[in-house]
Amino acid sequence: ELEAWARTAGHGFLAFDYSGHGESDGAFEDGTISAWRADALAAIDAHTSGPVILVGSSMGGWMALLTALARPARVAGLVLIAPAPDFTEKLMWPEFSPDAQAEIMEKGFTLRPSDYDEPYPITRALIEDGRTWQILDAPIQIDVPVRILQGKEDADVPWRHAERLVDTITSSDLVFTLIKDGDHRLSRDQDIARLKATCADIAHAAKA
């Protein structure tokens, strides 16, 4: 639906799956934040030109932020849905029991239950690599328009995590929308309508 909106509004549109996700090659357990950041940069560098607005959900929100920091001349705006920057260290690692943490460090991985699919492996490489890309502990020097959509009933990314991001990004043109009955995916009809309206707003604000 977002692609249809973009085409109708006269905007280009590019979507992709990170390696080990969706239709892309690779295994999830081989993935790291460094690798997925490289995927995002490669997609933008190879398949787009001019100013771009990045739309990222959950981990994709972290990737959008890292991409904006790496390509400040290219990124004209950000739309972040339930953004999860630093999730490996600040959300995931503290939730693991001492036994699971030990298993990751000694065995190299542990299986994490999922509400959406089969349990999936969280690797030592993912955790340790994620520590090199933490961005919430200092001001995030992004000065383009930013829009954040966050569900208050999100069971995966606490809304306070998104609120912390609001306080960390330097942009003065930042709007944080907290959807009181919204979950993590924000995929209901009203959520999609809100997302499209938000994209239209930021396209105007960014003049992209």
What are these regions (language model features)?
Residues 3-25:
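Conserved alpha/beta-hydrolase
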Residues 22-47:
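Catalytic nucleophile-loop/oxyanion-hole region of alpha/beta-hydrolase
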Residues 74-122:
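Hydrolase active-site cap/lid region
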Residues 142, 148-150, 154:
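Short beta-strand/loop motif that positions the catalytic acidic residue
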Residues 144, 158-167:
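Short alpha-helix in the alpha/beta-hydrolase fold that links the catalytic acid
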Residues 153-157, 185:
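Acidic catalytic loop of the alpha/beta-hydrolase fold
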Residues 169-185:
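Catalytic histidine neighborhood in serine/cysteine hydrolases
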Residues 182-195:
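Catalytic histidine-centered segment of alpha/beta-hydrolase-like enzymes
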